[in-house]
Amino acid sequence: MSQHWKLETDEAGIAWLCIDKADADANVLSSDVIQELNEHLESLGKNPPTGLVLNSGKERSFIMGADINEFKDFSSPEEVAKMCHLAQQVFLKIRALPCPSVAAVNGVCLGGGLEISMMFDYRIGPPGDSKIFGLPEVKLGLHPGFGGTVRAVQICGVRAGMQLMLTGNPVNSRKALKIGLIDRIAGEDDWRDVATSLIATRPPVQKAPLVDRIMGIGLLRPIVRNMLIKQVSGKARKDHYPSPYAMIDLWAAHGASSKTGYLAEAESFGRVACTDTSRNLIRVFFLQSKLKKQGNKTDVELKHIHVVGAGVMGGDIAAWCALRGHTVTLQDREQKYIDPALERAQKLFGKRVRDEKKRAETAARLKADVSGDGAAEADLIIEAIFENLEAKQDLYKALQAKMKPGALLATNTSSIRLEELRTVLDEPKRFIGLHFFNPVAMLPLVEVIRCEDTDQAAMDIGFAFTKGIGKFPLECMSAPGFVVNRVLAPYMGEAMALAKEGVPLEEIDKAAVNFGMPMGPIELVDSVGLDIAQHVAGILTSGTDREMPDTDIAGLVKKGHLGRKTGQGYYLWIDGKAVKPAADGVPVPDDIEDRLLLPMVNEAVACLSEGVVADSDLLDAGVIFGTGFAPFRGGPVNYARERGVDSVVAALKGLAERHGERFAPHSGWSGL
């Protein structure tokens, strides 16, 4: 009795094979699913049908990929390679059948799902703009392991095939058709007819373009390999992210050879799967799921969002909410303050919404509201004005007089504690924080902030709203700087202290980037704005017992050198880019990396110890998605554990002896 597959043969002798994983919302290729598939393919091999069609029993979802949970059970590269090779042998039985075969894809088709579909002679994709076809393994520190490195190049060619695998970015059906990944586009009503027609007519199967086949000739492969390596090295270092380099080397050694490519792929997959990079990136994948599971289900429907404050943060929050389907009113003192936000919104919609009609509908959902009438209709009001306690409280008094029953008020404050803000409210327990990060369209985290006695129903609405607009919520307690800003502050502060000591700015940033940060801390300070960084540092200094180092920030702010927005900060900025002078031979401290990163790790441990976040997993997730902390290191607490807690504490003590008590290990280290 098959648990996950259903096989039927029609009067024409066509076998219709449907995958519908039992007790699951989505199809994944777990070991038992693959074993059952093997049994069906063995049977079909003995009694070949006139054609084979694979489809999914899940609505708008084909196959999500391999079961990542099973990867935790493997202990050696050899064990992983054996698993991959066994799966390959099962999938290759599809290609060995003497009849034409069709994979009818109805929705998300990622990783192993796309790999199995590429074993079929023909592939059908659904209509629509959704990007459902992809090989995202590289984002987990892996590469395709079920035959994808061979078949993607055989079908699409080295250019398009490698692009799919090296970026991990999915494509929609139109793009898939253009690069040869699928053969037809058909909807729910006609995919069966299209599949039957393909089996009956047997058109030529997709092959890589001639140019790509020439590029795969042995003498040319080393040249193409070097081009691919150059492309990848500009985005990821081999010691940080080895899998894209392994992918390129696989192709350089084997091309798209069916004879040697599959086994080599399995062995390479085994090696990358057992690296710290892959283990940590898989951990980050599961951390995303943990963030999404926060909060209870709520029946409250948020249709209308009212945002007060049309500055960079407020305006971009409003635009993002409109993009995600909400009706949004944006309030500020005068229309001239709202207009720049509307202009930025139009640019966002132009990039994100391809269809002109849908783009116009999206833009129509965002309305300027100088009078603030939208507050009376809103289900959720987000305050995003400047960081001033009295100004915010005056606004709250006016808003609560307008709000309809059941509406929720939230603040986007980055530094003021909720306990102080809410004292003027009639229902202080229903007041929450929704702290977004800049740029709103790029950074996926929102801190959902509470006080000790905050109403859980209000928090659940905050969680639902955050997830509904495609962001990751992080629950945290009201505390100075909350989580992300608090952890970032000592990192940026130490960078500015190094700058004051005369360490070249470029060398400071280089040390952080070499660790794996997305940009250096000096460039980050300039991007955030020196005035904002100074303000947050002041809040943290007064609200915690942490000492901030001596820096030049006050003098730069006094001169009006605020960073990128004024064209001058620590760096000179031209056309939105920092001009970084070459280091002039000034010696760089041996402990520069620890001086930058360990204060950040120390502050993360302090947040955990003080209960600002519930556990180390959530803290690591928040810092990764809120700051870009090197994902392949798994977060600050995970990094400390991998390096060794005793080793990190000893390093902090050494830094404290040399540079001051601000490096002293927090008492929370004893709890790790």
PLM regions: where:
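Conserved CoA-thioester-binding segment of acyl-CoA-metabolizing enzymes
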Residues: M1-N55, L92
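N-terminal glycine-rich phosphate-binding loop for ADP-containing cofactors
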Residues: E8-D10, A22, P49-L52, F74-S76, ...
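Terminal peptide-recognition signature
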Residues: L17, E36-L37, L54, D67, ...
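Short beta-strand segments
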Residues: C18, N55-S56, A104, H435
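Amphipathic alpha-helical interaction surfaces in cytosolic regulatory modules
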Residues: D32, K46, E59-D73, F91
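Structural preference for long, well-ordered alpha-helical segments in enzyme cores
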Residues: L37-H40, L44, I116, I317, ...
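Glycine-rich beta-to-alpha active-site loop
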Residues: Q88, K93-L140, P144, V312
